[in-house]
Amino acid sequence: MFFHLIVTDDCNLCCSYCRAKMFEEEDPAGHSPGTIDETICENLNFPLADLYTFLEKDKDAVLTFIGGEPLLRTDKILEIMDHAPIKRFMLQTNGTLLAKLPTEYTNQLETILISIDGDKDLTDKHRGEGIYDMVISTAQTIRKNGYNGELIARMTIAEDTDIFSAVTHLANYFTSIHWQMDADFTGDFSHRRFAVWSKEYNAGIRKLVSEWVSRIERTGAVPKWYPFLSTTEDLLLERSSKLRCGSGYANYSIMTNGWIAPCPIMVGMADYYAGHIKGADPAHLPEIPIGEPCLSCDIYGFCGGRCLYSNIVRPWRDEYQLVCDTIRNLHDALIENLPRIQKMLDEGTLSMDAFSHTRYNGCEIIP
């Protein structure tokens, strides 16, 4: 089982997609999030012995440190890595403090997801001046210091993102890239130009899929561009998927008070809790399933539902369909290029092993 551990809700940045939205007026959501847990605290606030007892029941557990910015509590991270009865750790970080993490701990991390949105202008516009240079420098430093795990550029994209340019730029520095659209997570649709931009995005995705396949044809290696990687593997194997991030059945989030939510975005949504670390068995957590209208969609087996939180709360109400249109475009673009990949497989210049990757590692897969 995979677990996100929210080490702290505090953060040292105020990115436009995240904390800056606290100051914006929101449109009413389509549905209520239900009962709100008011015992959530800013920092991890339960005995670590309870966490270790919980994890001990699943020797194959994977623990991902998230926040806020988890490295604001490096002390807790080091303590947990020293004493938790598991061997697999991951980290999601904005990169500002990563260079200060002791090398021997950095190099134990199986995967590091580091936030960066594209080139310098785009990243600094949304995350703060100097962030791009800091992230690129930090990524290079940890590699020089012996980090051999997977380093994933984790992008957030919005209306000023040219998806083709942003991804191909980052491909100069990262072999693994994931992007998530800032869409249908808060009630901000009325002051967005998403409907217009999504047409540009869809065209960019079609161009980017073709570029991805061209790179495979030239090199025989599959770039780990996650929205293409996992989905293409399943299309080739004719395999369907539930929610691709794993939330609510393979991937759960441990909040600062010890309660277990199906997803990091669903912090405090008490009606959807899967238990508490004090008494829960990680091997027998209840599944929190996706609901309609996703289940009746003809490409549900490809998409899996995109986002459990959005499916429940409907921040964009009926306009969620615009997001669905981008997913259908992704599906169609991959299907269109699948014969090129199948040809390489048939000729023996490419093997299915080239698509190997870790699922549920913090990449939502469906943007």
What are these model-predicted stretches?
Residues C18, K125-H126, M266, S310:
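Residue-level signal for well-ordered alpha-helical positions
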